[in-house]
């Protein structure tokens, strides 16, 4: 089936938009794993709860941007509490214990959201409703704006890690936790802050993407599987690799949907995952070991 250039360009934009949101989610998960060696199965539920905080804040204030900030702050604090009460006592033990703990947290949060908000999906209205014409097809401005916002948040994270004092502490903790603590860096609070930052990024992703898909108690499950695929393909703990993998996989799915249904196009990401595990288990976008 022939595909017009206009449709190809639209799918390219769709892939980039989805890829940037996925990169934002994956960045938080990668940050947590790269520094703490914790596989957080509850990460998708932080996205879901962030979206619900956005729904409530938007209903109270009418401001989408206030809802975005409130979701990030509330879930950052909530993530820190979850870490301190559930994960911190398990650090240093068998990694399976933290996996089971985060999986349990995920189930609890899903069922809490179902009990509190019900099974009916909620809606967050787009702050921008305009469209522009690309060739003869209309494309929403909001999709481009959320891609730009996601890129700005990821860029801010990179600058924070590169130049901020707390970011330097985080990088020092990643390289040698014992030496960092010996130099006076408060490693336990650095780890708490890292988990809070990762949770906030998931919450921001939930609010940004909610106008496109709606908000329900199971939305985190849909995201966490794809996020783990991105993290593995990009290289476990590799922030830049996760961003590249998110855009790469989203573009592949977008292009595949030109010929097959979107439900079938999802298979592409699993094919990439299997090929990565078979031929380059360190990740497609991970630096080649010297």
Regions found by a protein language model. Give the residues of each.
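Transmembrane alpha-helical segments of polytopic membrane transport and secretion proteins
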Residues: 1-7, 82, 87-91, 281-290
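Membrane-interfacial amphipathic/re-entrant helices at transmembrane-helix boundaries
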Residues: 1-24, 53, 61-67, 93-98, ...
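Cytosolic-side transmembrane-helix boundaries in multi-pass membrane proteins
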Residues: 7, 25, 116, 175-182, ...
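Membrane-embedded helix boundary and interhelical linker motif in transport proteins
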Residues: 13, 35-81, 85, 259
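Alpha-helical transmembrane segments within multi-pass membrane transporters and channels
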Residues: 62-105, 112, 244-249, 280-281
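Transmembrane helix-bundle core of multi-pass membrane transporters
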Residues: 89-163, 190-193, 255, 260-263, ...
């Amino acid at each position: 089936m022939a595909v017009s250039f206009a449709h190809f360009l639209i799918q390219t934009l769709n892939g980039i938009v989805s890829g940037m949101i996925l990169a934002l989610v994956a960045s938080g998960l990668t940050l947590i794993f790269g520094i703490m060696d914790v596989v957080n199965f509850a990460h998708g539920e932080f996205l879901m709860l962030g979206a619900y905080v956005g729904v409530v804040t938007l209903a109270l204030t009418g401001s989408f941007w206030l809802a975005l900030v409130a979701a990030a702050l509330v879930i950052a604090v909530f993530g820190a509490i979850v870490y301190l009460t559930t994960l911190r006592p398990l650090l240093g033990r068998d990694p399976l214990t933290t996996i089971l703990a985060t999986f349990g947290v995920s189930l609890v949060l899903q069922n809490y959201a179902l009990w509190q908000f019900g099974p009916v999906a909620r809606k967050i209205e787009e702050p921008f409703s305009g469209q522009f014409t690309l060739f003869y097809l209309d494309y929403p401005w909001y999709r481009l704006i959320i891609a730009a916002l996601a890129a700005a948040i990821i860029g801010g994270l990179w600058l924070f890690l590169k130049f901020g004092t707390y970011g330097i502490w985080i990088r020092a903790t990643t390289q040698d936790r014992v030496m960092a603590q010996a130099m006076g860096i408060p490693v336990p609070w650095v780890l708490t802050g890292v988990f809070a930052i990762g949770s906030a990024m998931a919450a921001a992703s939930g609010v940004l993407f909610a106008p496109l898909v709606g908000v329900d108690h199971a939305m985190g499950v849909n995201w966490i599987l794809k996020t783990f695929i991105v993290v593995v393909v990009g290289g476990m703990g590799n922030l830049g690799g996760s961003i590249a993998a998110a855009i790469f996989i989203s573009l592949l799915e977008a292009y595949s949907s030109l010929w097959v249904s979107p439900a079938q196009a999802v298979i592409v990401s699993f094919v990439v995952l299997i090929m990565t595990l078979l031929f380059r288990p360190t990740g497609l976008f991970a630096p080649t070991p010297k």
